[in-house]
Amino acid sequence: SAASDVYKRQGVAVLGAAYYFLRKIPYTGRIAVWFTGITLAVCILFCLVNIKISKCIAFYGGWDCGMVANSARWLYEGQTLGYDDYYTIYSNNIPVTWLLYQLYSFASGLKGYPYNPEFIWIQFQCVMLSLAVFCSVLLVLQVSRNLGISVIALVFQSIFLGISPWKIIPYTDGSTIAMPILILLLYSLFRKNGRKRKYLLWFLIMFLGCLGGIMKATCYVTLIAVVLVDLVWSAWEEVPMRKRLQKTGLKILLL
């Protein structure tokens, strides 16, 4: 409609103006800390709004997400899953079933929890969505060092992930949605940190990649991409071959 077109143009104009003025602000450590704090506050608000919306649109899903949700409830009730062919075929759903069971048990034992224990699954996924937005914006800030681009990233990430239906579906997609971008953010920090922190960051990258990968193969894809890119970077470094091989060997050992 004509009204919606006007709103779209106004939104684009506001974003364009924000980008124009913010890109002129010089990037400093203080500015980065300030912007990170604002982004964190926006992401917390984003999480609370998502939880509020989810209370109005939540429903029971079928197919795989229904299977893992039912299994989590059965485990809490003391039932056994037996030798179900489902988990033999889709073994990647075993970890997410265990995760949902732990969350369900926590909510059930929490005095004064105001919702059905199953709602904690949705709350957890809203937190993961907010973490994905936060990590995405920080990654853009790290790479671009430009506040204008980072603000645009914050707006678009909030919109696109805000309308994501996965927040109300307790399944692997929502539970691991922040993992790939978190891995990329850690690798960006890895490239910029000194020697002492590098191997700790590398270990975290490998750990999170494998932790997410047992539930969603996308995390393995991200991890493989990071390793390949790092091998290329290592090949370009102007250091003696022996030192280069030692660093590569230690990274492989951590992997």
Task: State the predicted function of each range.
Residues 144, 181-201:
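Membrane-interface transmembrane helices that cradle and orient dolichyl/undecaprenyl
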Residues 199-217, 227-228:
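Membrane-interface alpha helices of multi-pass inner-membrane proteins
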Residues 131-159:
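Transmembrane-helix signature of polytopic, membrane-embedded enzymes
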Residues 2-7:
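Short, small-residue-biased leader/transition segments that mark boundaries at the very start
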Residues 166-176:
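Short acidic/glycine- and proline-prone juxtamembrane loop motifs at membrane-interface regions
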Residues 67-71, 86-119, 123-127:
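Short hydrophobic/aromatic helix or loop-helix immediately within or flanking a transmembrane segment
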Residues 222-254:
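Perimembrane helix-loop-helix junctions
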Residues 52-69, 221, 247-255:
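Juxtamembrane membrane-water interface segments immediately following transmembrane helices
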